[in-house]
């Protein structure tokens, strides 16, 4: 494959030679971040015979150099996008395969990266033998921070992508640089038939209202502070605010991998949340992320509160009603006092309610846990 690095607004040349069918053809349309080609220059939305198998999607794949986390956030007008588009392995890379998505880009791409290929090299190797290449959209990032994105010429408007350049551009005319409130943003912009290469993240989309969705994905991810999951979630919400999929919303997913980050350290699935079908899948994804944090993330120091008599009075009637609270052990305790018996009953209750990672032994309670307990018991 010979792909010329794009200049914004000018389509690149792409020539293919050879090729054979994929071993695992899939039927989803992968979304790449939009490019700034005028709508008049892109093909009209004329559904092909395989249109219903396409994942009308926008996604972002990214690497967090501070933690080593890798992740993907995606939304689509297609059910169960989380079972098709996102692929990731800790210490290796992350892949989003959309727009008649081919799972081989996930499986083989990550295998190639694990053997030493960069995100770009892995992408180009797989592209060589893809006989339906121009129906694909793919974003890749490796654990060294390299990123790459490709949008096929037969993807539906609006379609394109953006990747972060993460430093001084080597081909200045291929980059867009803008100064924002938080510093300088640097992105590589690409359209149909183009492979774009950069650093840190790759955002891509197809069948969008306009290029604003991909622009929002890229800019919001760069400007948002916090952990990778929060940055990906913010980017996904901003992408939808930019117009999103022309056909609407249906499913969404968030995948973040970290070495030993899964349950009891048994795997790398630090966060793996999927919304199969919902009227507002992004809002549901955000709700489930908050729930996941509550039950699987430890407390933050800023959220810890001393258990005051006022808090004891709030929790006392709840513990009296709950078997796990063991009321017979502390009914005779001094009223309003968070003594050892009360604290032991509270810990038993918290374990019973799956707040395990936020249980305290120091006379404090997590503010978020307290709010959750009171909210549930007030229903």
Please tell me what each predicted stretch does.
Residues 1-22:
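N-terminal secretory signal peptides that target proteins for export/translocation
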Residues 9-11, 34, 40, 358:
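Intrinsically disordered and other compositionally biased segments
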Residues 15, 23-25, 166, 187:
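Secreted/luminal cysteine- and crosslink-motif detector
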Residues 25-38:
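Bacterial N-terminal signal peptides
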Residues 42-247, 254-256, 277-303, 330, ...:
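Alpha/propeptide regions of enzymes that mature by internal proteolysis
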Residues 248-251, 265:
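C-terminal substrate-recognition/cap domain of FAD-linked oxidoreductases
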Residues 261-279, 283-287:
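Long, contiguous interaction/recruitment modules in multidomain scaffold/adaptor proteins
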Residues 303-378:
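Short acidic, glycine/serine/threonine-rich helix-capping segments at coil-helix boundaries
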């Amino acid at each position: 494959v010979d792909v010329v690095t794009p200049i914004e607004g000018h389509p690149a040349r792409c020539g293919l030679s050879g090729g054979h069918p994929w071993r695992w053809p899939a039927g989803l349309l992968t979304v790449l971040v939009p490019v700034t080609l005028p709508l008049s220059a892109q093909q009209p939305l004329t559904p092909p015979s395989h249109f219903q198998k396409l994942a009308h999607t926008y996604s972002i794949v990214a690497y967090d150099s501070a933690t080593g986390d890798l992740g993907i956030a995606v939304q689509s007008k297609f059910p169960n996008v989380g079972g098709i588009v996102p692929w990731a392995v800790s210490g290796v890379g992350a892949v989003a395969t959309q727009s008649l998505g081919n799972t081989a880009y996930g499986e083989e791409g990550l295998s190639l990266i694990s053997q030493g290929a960069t995100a770009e090299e892995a992408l180009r190797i797989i592209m060589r033998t893809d006989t339906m290449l121009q129906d694909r959209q793919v974003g890749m990032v490796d654990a060294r921070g390299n990123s790459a994105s490709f949008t096929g010429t037969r993807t539906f408007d609006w379609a394109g992508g953006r990747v972060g350049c993460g430093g001084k551009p080597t081909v200045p005319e291929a980059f867009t640089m803008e100064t924002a409130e938080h510093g300088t943003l640097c992105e590589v912009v690409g359209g149909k038939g183009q492979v774009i290469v950069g650093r840190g993240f790759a955002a891509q989309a197809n069948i969008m209202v306009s290029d604003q969705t991909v622009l929002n994905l890229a800019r919001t991810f760069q400007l948002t502070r916090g952990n990778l999951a929060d940055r990906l979630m913010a980017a996904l919400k901003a992408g939808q605010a930019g117009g999103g999929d022309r056909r609407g919303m249906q499913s969404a997913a968030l995948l973040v991998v970290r070495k030993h980050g899964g349950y009891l350290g048994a795997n790398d699935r630090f966060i793996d949340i999927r919304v199969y079908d919902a009227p507002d899948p992004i809002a549901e994804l955000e709700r489930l992320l908050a729930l996941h944090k509550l039950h699987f993330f430890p407390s933050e120091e800023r959220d810890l509160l001393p258990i005051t008599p006022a808090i004891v009075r709030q929790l006392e009637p709840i513990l009296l009603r709950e078997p796990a609270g063991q009321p017979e052990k502390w009914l005779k305790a001094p009223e309003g006092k968070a003594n050892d018996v009360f604290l032991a009953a509270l810990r038993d209750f918290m374990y019973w309610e799956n707040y395990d990672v936020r249980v305290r032994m120091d006379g404090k309670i997590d503010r978020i846990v307290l709010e959750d307990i009171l909210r549930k018991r007030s229903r």
